[in-house]
Amino acid sequence: MNAENIKKITEDIVSQLGFYLVGFNFRGHGKNQVVEVFIDGKNYINADDCAIVSRHLNEKYRAMFSPDDSYRLDVSSPGIDRPLKFIEQFPKHLNKKFEISYSYNNEIRKTNAELINVNNDELSFLTRDGKELIIKFKDIIKAKVLISFS
């Protein structure tokens, strides 16, 4: 089975169910194939969400894989340490601190700041010195939520 075909079908199903495919890995062959799927959504992902996606993917995969092949499907949330890929992922992280890399006037800048607003294609952050930083989503290279233990 072709990894690109599986990924495309996976993206379609995940999207139809109202989630985003934020990570995909297909490895192995024959009886040792593993499909790892990482999903996210506008709300936090829970075990029920993963089970729903898994059930729909398994229905489709059974028709795609040869009877001589077997596979293991793992569906999970991406985890807090993964960068956000879609602007729709940001609102649920309002008032959280981010590590951000972004493009500004053909240079790459990095900062840590608190997300204070999401408006269409722009994200507003509050910097350490209390200034508002507005970044267009298209200019963000990498944005990760910083884990806080306080």
Task: Label every PLM stretch briefly.
Residues 1-112, 116-150:
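Short Lys/Arg-rich amphipathic alpha-helical segments
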